[in-house]
């Protein structure tokens, strides 16, 4: 056994590849061939693929030292295969590759010296060795056959009698063979050469007549080599028969590469069918070779799927020594075809052939054939058919018996006769002697020459052989073919007189016979008189001469191109005329004329076709112009009609608008009658503004509140931004799809741009934004508008641009035009100029050489004093990332100072500040109002400042920054108005700038004077990272004005740093490949989206979410159970495998084919606002095996509404919470889903979504509970249990109450009256999300999607980074200035405890509870003197205030009017006051609320309660009047991060005493479990609405150590840790700010001599504990 030898050969570039400037993607080193993917960036894993073969031939450039010639290929492959044939083996060499890859050149070669291919060289070498080794005892005989396979039809190329398609048969011993294929005997190499030449001529004639090319047909040249050796000792003659198969396959290119259509495409499909089958055979044989040898099952090899593979069966994995030559192209434009060829060759390496020596095959074969013939004769006789035998075995006559054959099976008889005739043909061929074979070969040759002569093909004078030669005198035609191998193979004489040309069907015999389409019976006549040939066309004959259609007779000149019909192309040559022209030119020494050029230049088939297109193009242009004129007229006519229709529609719509306007006015007049004012009060429009009754009567406080609300909502832009993203996503996808198809290497993606100091909008985008309004009368700063833009990443030029949405839509029109023009351009048409069609490429913009690295800002307030300062400021890019640092010195110039830098530049300038310059576009961030500060940080900033002022007593307090300005209220003498002031700005160094930038320079200017900028010289940036020294000194002289002084106080100077990249193109520009600081978790959207409710068949589509005022919010705990029918007839909850890492997640373990019920239990605190009436519907749908779901699955038939059982309110002993439970029967088979009907496969998880529609009292809509459940279905009798050992050993799954899944929901009750107001309807507008709309060519984007809502979150983080950087820069400047002025006189450094407090506060500020809107402005904190002093209120005052509060809220009832008991109620509208982050920070506010704590104590008769302490209890809720609400139930995705977990002693209001519970803190929720092993959440506390208290007064009152309380809106909890060291840890997990405050207070007391130490506090607590125990 031996493997197939595989060689790869790469050819040089052809003319087409050179014209397209193709690049070489093939590399060869030894036997390894590497191919580079031009579509993949270099230096990646997929860019280069390497293959190892037996031989790799580099024939790309003949100048290379490793160039492989034809002889080298033959020495490696041909000589080895020839030696195998002499050894008696079958041999096969086949060439594979796309058209034009060099297969025919490698196999056949050319006529020139050293250009022969493998077939001629192996034949020549064969006869050379025969002559050298032939003796009397060793005789050789050689026979050849030549066939062509085209469209699964086999054609004999050597015998003209075999005009039809030959039949492929199979014999048990011979295998597949071609019946009646000529096998001709040859005696020397010249015979083989002549046969190859004649076969090619026959192939050329047939291909021309049928409009074929050799690239679409397979050619198989077979040599039958027989060796007869006579042994003198035994007097026996042995034979060895070898079959040498040399195959030239058709082109293997894809159909889309050839551009074939119609019939050509069908032919190509048949050709590719053979090649496809060949590939299947190669792959199947490779898989068989790679499998283990002991496989019992026989592998199927699809040999019979095509004639080619069926004939080559023995050569592929059978009895043969096989070699494959893969011919490939080196050009990048043929990458796909070349890679496919290399993969085929790589698979072919694994094929194993089992070659054996073919010895003494004829004797055995003849014997078996005779036996088979005798059996067939007996069979025919049994059928009643007589067979007459003659002496010759080659002839038999079959006589059928009509009487008996009627009663027999006709098909069996015909098959037997067919087999008999085939076997007799084989016997006759085998018994034929060598002399008879030579005689038959000669007869076929004579017949072949007669056929050629009859067709008009020229023969030599002896009339014996056919050859290609150039006649000396006679004019002639030479054929031209698309395939160079078939060109100039046929020669037709033009005899003296008339030479007729037509088909063989003509009445008059034609001298030259052609066939094919568009050839008439009598097509034309050539008249030869005195060596002048005139072409006479017949009527309706299609004839072109030199590209012009011939209508009248024309004299042919030598070198003329003659096209007959559509397919037959010839070159006319008149030797006498050519000789006369040459002699005339030589004698007269004239210049070369056109005739000589035509005769001497290369004239081939391509030249003739191009000439035809060029000459016929004149008529085509005229026809095209006529067609364009018609289209233009049609366009004008249709446009006129469209304008008329549009005018009519406009008038119709205007009339409708007028009618609606009148209707609105009538309704307005009708409604005005109900007003308290008469209509005469506002007859005129301006009365609304001038009538005193419409003047505002607001107080100053009301006006301030209105302004606050206006400013607050003016900064909320998320909805409009999302609408822009959704609405324009389809345009972005279309632009990217067109870019990919046109190979523009341009990408488009959404981006958000905000006009800030660090990221000013480009001028073209700034013009699309409304002008920035200055601050209003209430001091509101200007709005920084955020807009949606398109980021254009030009990877070809390495540039990044920003387009507006309008510009994208305009450019998209040009892109569509370019795409249509590209699609309509013909492959043969000349390249068009893009600029001439569209005025420029719409994909590209001009880009500057220098790119912006970043910006920096330096404040100038040190010039007020005046003192010099040296700043080190960050260089920040537009995304808020620090790209380096800049050192700047700013100092006043009070006298003539000399600055000397070695390489520095010193310049001077003069500026003038006008009065308008005092109002800059941007405001400093420290001038934001406290209201917006509260919006941004959830009220933390003001409390943190208060904490720092009270607790620390030093550091940077709120007046730190203002002290500098207080000293500068009166400017010094150097800043007197009217005088000139000079200051110096020195750009020292830049550090930390990336090595990708070169030639760094700095440019700076005042914020309002962009046109007057100062620039440094460029500095070379080395990769060593050394600081870049600018040392640029700029003296600026300014006449002092009030605006200039104001600018020094508040505004900075802007520094811009530029540079350009080291390498080009700048493909890394858009990637921003540097380490960026990730946003905090609170800035990110939810990682797993909450599923939307399943659409109910009963309620229909869900209405829009209401946006009215939220009256109340409640935390709801929901338990989900899936019960299965047990053997005892009861429904038992199925086992739930709870997740340890993800809270409220679990996996239901179900059994197949068992009745089920879904049980849902709702748990919440008792309240009069939430009362469950009934369950309306429970819908289950979206059955899937992935966690993600889509709303499109609601349209499926798998959505099922379950049968319901009545809901019931439960009462749990010892638990006063509200419980509501309902069940529904679930027949999962009704979903008709295979996922639920069958047993789940290994590792498969099934997901469903259920939605419960519940009815509540006083609610206009149902409340919807939606939950995603995951499950695994086992067999009916399988034992289910947790798959994890932890849950299995715990045994909790045996407890029915543990087999439930928990969901945490937030129930929001909104006012229903506002649901239909016009303002709400406007806010509920829905914009269609076009990101999922299909765009043609979208599949080329490979899953790319436009960015959506996540872009808004990312942009918010970028803006927050910019905000922080600006604040830090300003504060660093103030600190540096204070230090320079010596104002920071505090000698005590900051203690470690105070640093811990700051860290705690910073961590709390980044809690997910609070959302930051960094772009909103802030104003200074209110003056502490304006804060109303706090006071103690007596009981009557407190009752009165609560009563007034209820009256304002509309919650006060008559029953409370006579109720003298005061109730401290925390209503839903008081959530802001009950916020733990607000009420738990200030110690003063805590002490003022002591009366609330004391009133929230339970009765003193509790035996188990601590002495003197009662559990904190909430106030009871007052009775609510009848009111309609709109409920919203939203599932809360609980954070997986555990802040603290452990055991706590819990005492709750209404409980029976202390209980030890397992508590887990997942902010902002606290979950309470029965024990550590309990997997179900039994209670939940919302820390966002809870009040945490831990003070010495409380500890002294309860007399129990290590306690703290958590008070919610509905109940209070007293929590006790198991150890005194755990108190701070639990407090830090629940409320970090309170823990930091207590720790800071304890640390501060250690520094005060009169304070009580921590040990004394512990001793006191211990004493109290002892007394309590006694």
From Swiss-Prot:
Keywords: ATP-binding, Cell projection, Coiled coil, Cytoplasm, Cytoskeleton, Microtubule, Motor protein, Nucleotide-binding, Phosphoprotein, Protein transport, Transport. It comes from Drosophila melanogaster. The modification Phosphoserine is found at residue 1416. Residues 1537-1635 form the PH domain. Residues 963-975 have a biased composition (Basic and acidic residues). It comes from the Eukaryota. This is Kinesin-like protein unc-104. One of its GO terms (biological process) is larval locomotory behavior.
């Amino acid at each position: 056994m031996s493997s197939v030898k595989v060689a790869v050969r790469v050819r040089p570039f052809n003319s087409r590849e050179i014209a397209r400037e193709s690049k070489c993607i093939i590399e060869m080193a030894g036997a390894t061939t590497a191919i580079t993917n031009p579509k993949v960036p270099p230096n990646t894993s997929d860019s280069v693929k390497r293959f190892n073969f037996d031989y790799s031939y580099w024939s790309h450039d003949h100048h290379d030292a490793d160039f492989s010639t034809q002889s080298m290929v033959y020495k490696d492959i041909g000589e080895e295969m020839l030696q195998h044939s002499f050894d008696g083996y079958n041999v096969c060499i086949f060439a594979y590759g796309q058209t034009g890859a060099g297969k025919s050149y490698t196999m056949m070669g050319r006529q020139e010296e050293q250009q022969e291919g493998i077939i001629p060289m192996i034949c020549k070498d064969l006869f050379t060795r025969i002559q050298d080794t032939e003796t009397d005892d060793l005789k050789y005989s050689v026979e050849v056959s030549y066939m062509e396979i085209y469209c699964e039809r086999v054609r004999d190329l050597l015998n003209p009698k075999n005009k039809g398609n030959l039949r492929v048969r199979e014999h048990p011993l011979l295998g597949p063979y071609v019946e009646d294929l000529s096998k001709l005997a040859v005696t020397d190499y010249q015979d083989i050469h002549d046969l190859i030449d004649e076969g090619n001529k026959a192939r050329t004639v047939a291909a021309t007549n049928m409009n074929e090319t050799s690239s679409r047909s397979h050619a198989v040249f077979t040599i039958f080599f027989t060796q007869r050796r006579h042994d003198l000792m035994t007097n026996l003659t042995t034979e060895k028969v070898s079959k040498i198969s040399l195959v030239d396959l058709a082109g293997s290119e894809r159909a889309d590469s050839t551009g074939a259509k119609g019939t050509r495409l069908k032919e190509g499909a048949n050709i590719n069918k053979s090649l496809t089958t060949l590939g299947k055979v190669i792959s199947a044989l490779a898989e068989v070779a790679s499998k283990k040898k002991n496989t019992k099952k026989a592998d199927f090899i699809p040999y019979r799927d095509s004639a080619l593979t069926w004939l080559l069966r023995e050569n592929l994995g059978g009895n043969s020594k096989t070699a494959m030559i893969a011919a490939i192209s080196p050009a990048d434009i043929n990458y796909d075809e070349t890679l496919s060829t290399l993969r085929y060759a790589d698979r072919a390496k694994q094929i194993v052939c089992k070659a054996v020596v073919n010895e003494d095959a004829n004797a055995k074969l003849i014997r078996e054939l005779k036996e088979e013939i005798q059996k067939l004769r007996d069979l025919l006789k049994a059928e009643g058919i007589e067979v007459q035998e003659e002496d010759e075995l080659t002839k038999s006559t079959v006589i059928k018996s009509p009487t008996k054959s009627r009663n027999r099976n006709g098909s069996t008889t015909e098959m037997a006769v067919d087999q008999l005739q085939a076997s007799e043909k084989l016997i006759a061929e085998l018994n034929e002697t060598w002399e008879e074979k030579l005689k038959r070969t000669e007869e076929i040759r004579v017949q072949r020459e007669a056929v050629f002569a009859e067709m008009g093909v020229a023969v030599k004078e002896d009339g014996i052989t056919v050859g290609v030669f150039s006649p000396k005198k006679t004019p002639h035609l030479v054929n031209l073919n698309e395939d160079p191998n078939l060109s100039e193979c046929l020669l037709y004489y033009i005899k003296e007189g008339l030479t007729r040309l037509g088909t063989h069907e003509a009445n008059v015999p034609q001298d030259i016979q052609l066939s094919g389409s568009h050839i008439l019976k009598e097509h034309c006549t050539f008249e030869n008189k005195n060596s002048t040939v005139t072409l006479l066309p017949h009527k309706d004959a299609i004839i072109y001469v030199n590209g012009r259609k011939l209508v009248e007779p024309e004299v042919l000149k030598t070198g003329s191109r003659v096209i007959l019909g559509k397919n037959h192309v010839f070159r006319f040559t008149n030797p006498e005329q050519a000789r006369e022209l040459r002699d005339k030119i030589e004698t007269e020494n004239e210049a070369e004329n056109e005739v000589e050029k035509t005769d001497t230049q290369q004239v081939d088939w391509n030249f003739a076709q191009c000439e035809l297109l060029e000459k016929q193009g004149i008529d085509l242009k005229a026809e095209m112009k006529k067609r364009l004129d018609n289209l233009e007229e049609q366009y004008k006519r249709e446009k006129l009609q469209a304008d008329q229709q549009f005018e009519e529609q406009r008038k119709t719509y205007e009339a409708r608008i007028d009618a609606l306007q009148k209707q609105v006015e009538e309704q307005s007049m009708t409604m005005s009658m109900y007003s308290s004012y008469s209509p005469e009060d506002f007859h005129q429009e301006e009365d609304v503004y001038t009538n005193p009754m419409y003047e505002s009567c607001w107080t100053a406080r009301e006006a301030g509140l209105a302004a606050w609300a206006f400013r607050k909502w003016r900064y909320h832009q998320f909805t409009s931004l999302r609408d822009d993203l959704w609405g324009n996503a389809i345009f972005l996808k279309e632009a990217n799809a067109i870019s990919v198809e046109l190979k523009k290497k341009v990408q488009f993606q959404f981006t958000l741009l905000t006009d800030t100091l660090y990221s000013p909008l480009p001028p073209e985008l700034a013009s699309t934004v409304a002008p920035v309004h200055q601050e209003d009368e209430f001091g509101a700063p200007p709005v920084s508008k955020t807009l949606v833009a398109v980021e254009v990443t030009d990877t070809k030029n390495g540039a990044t641009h920003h387009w507006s949405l309008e510009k994208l839509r305009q450019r998209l029109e040009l892109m569509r035009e370019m795409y249509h023009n590209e699609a309509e351009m013909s492959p043969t048409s000349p390249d068009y100029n893009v600029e001439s069609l569209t005025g420029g490429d719409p994909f590209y913009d001009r880009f500057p050489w220098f790119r912006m690295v970043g910006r920096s800002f330096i404040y100038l307030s040190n010039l007020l004093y005046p003192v010099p300062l040296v700043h080190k400021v960050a260089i920040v890019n537009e995304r808020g990332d620090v790209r380096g640092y800049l050192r700047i010195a700013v100092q006043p110039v009070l006298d003539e100072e000399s600055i000397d830098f070695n390489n520095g530049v010193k310049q001077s300038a003069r500026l003038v500040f006008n009065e308008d310059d005092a109002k800059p576009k941007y405001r400093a961030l420290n001038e934001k109002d406290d209201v917006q500060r509260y919006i941004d940080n959830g009220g933390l900033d003001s409390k943190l400042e208060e904490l720092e002022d009270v607790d620390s007593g030093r550091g940077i307090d709120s007046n730190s920054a203002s002290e500098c300005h207080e000293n500068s209220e009166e400017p010094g003498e150097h800043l007197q108005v009217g005088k000139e002031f000079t200051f110096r700005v020195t750009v020292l160094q830049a550090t930390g700038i990336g090595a990708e930038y070169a030639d760094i320079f700095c440019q700076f200017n005042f914020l309002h004077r962009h046109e007057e900028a100062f620039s440094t010289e460029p500095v070379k940036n080395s990769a060593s990272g050394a600081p870049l020294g600018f040392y640029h000194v700029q003296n600026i002289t300014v006449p002092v004005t009030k605006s200039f002084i104001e600018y020094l106080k508040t505004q900075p100077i802007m520094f811009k740093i530029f540079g350009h990249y080291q390498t080009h193109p700048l493909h890394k520009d858009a990637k921003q490949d540097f380490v960026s600081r990730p946003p905090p978790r609170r800035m990110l959207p939810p990682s797993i989206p909450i599923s939307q409710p399943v659409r109910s068949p009963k309620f229909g589509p869900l209405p829009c979410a209401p946006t009215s005022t939220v009256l109340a919010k409640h935390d709801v705990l929901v338990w989900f159970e899936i019960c299965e029918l047990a053997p005892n007839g009861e429904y038992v909850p199925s086992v739930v495998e709870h997740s340890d890492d993800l809270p409220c997640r679990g996996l239901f373990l179900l059994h197949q084919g068992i009745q089920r019920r879904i049980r849902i239990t709702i748990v919440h605190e008792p309240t009069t606002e939430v009362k469950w009436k009934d369950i309306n519907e429970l819908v289950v749908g979206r059955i899937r095996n992935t966690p993600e779901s889509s709303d499109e699955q609601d349209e499926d038939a798998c959505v099922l509404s379950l049968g319901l059982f009545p809901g019931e309110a439960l009462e749990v002993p010892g638990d006063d919470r509200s419980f509501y439970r309902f069940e529904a029967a679930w027949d999962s088979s009704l979903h008709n889903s295979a996922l639920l009907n069958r047993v789940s496969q290994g590792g498969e998880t099934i997901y469903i979504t259920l939605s419960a529609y519940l009815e509540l009292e006083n609610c206009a809509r149902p409340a919807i509970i939606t939950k995603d459940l995951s499950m695994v279905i086992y067999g009916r009798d399988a034992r289910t249990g947790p798959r994890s050992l932890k849950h299995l050993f715990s045994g909790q799954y045996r407890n029915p109450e543990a087999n439930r899944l928990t969901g945490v929901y937030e129930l929001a009750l909104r006012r229903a009256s506002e649901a239909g107001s016009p303002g709400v309807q406007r806010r509920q507008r829905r914009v269609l999300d076009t990101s999922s709309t299909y765009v043609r060519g979208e599949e080329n984007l490979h899953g790319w999607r436009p960015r959506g809502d996540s872009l808004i979150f990312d942009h918010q983080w970028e803006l927050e980074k910019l905000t922080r950087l600006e604040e830090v820069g300003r504060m660093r400047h103030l600190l540096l200035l204070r230090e320079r002025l010596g104002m920071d006189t505090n000698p005590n450094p900051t203690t470690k405890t105070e640093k811990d407090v700051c860290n705690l506060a910073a961590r709390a500020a980044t809690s997910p509870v609070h959302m930051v809107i960094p772009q909103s402005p802030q104003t200074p904190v209110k003056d502490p003197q304006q804060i109303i002093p706090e006071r103690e209120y007596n009981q009557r005052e407190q009752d009165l205030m609560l009563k007034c509060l209820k009256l304002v809220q509309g919650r006060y009832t008559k029953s409370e009017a006579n109720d003298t008991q005061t109730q401290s109620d925390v209503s839903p509208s008081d959530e802001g006051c009950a916020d733990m982050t607000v009420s738990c920070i200030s110690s003063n506010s805590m002490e003022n609320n002591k009366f609330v704590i004391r009133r929230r104590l339970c009765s003193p008769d509790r035996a188990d309660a601590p002495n003197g302490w009662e559990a904190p209890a909430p106030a009871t809720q007052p009775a609510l009047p009848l009111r309609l609400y709109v409920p919203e139930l939203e599932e809360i995705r609980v954070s997986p991060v555990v802040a603290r977990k452990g055991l706590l002693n819990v005492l709750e209001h209404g409980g029976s005493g202390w209980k030890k519970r397992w508590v887990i803190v997942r902010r902002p929720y606290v979950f309470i479990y029965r024990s550590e092993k309990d997997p179900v959440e039994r209670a939940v506390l919302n820390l966002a609405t809870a009040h945490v208290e831990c003070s010495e007064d409380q500890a002294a009152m309860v007399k129990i150590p290590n306690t703290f309380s958590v008070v919610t809106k509905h109940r209070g909890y007293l929590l006790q840790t198991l150890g005194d060291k755990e108190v701070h840890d639990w407090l830090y997990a629940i409320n970090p700010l309170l823990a930091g405050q207590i720790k800071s207070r304890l640390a501060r007391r250690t520094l005060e001599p009169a304070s009580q130490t921590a040990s004394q506090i512990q001793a006191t607590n211990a004493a109290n504990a002892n007394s309590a125990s006694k």
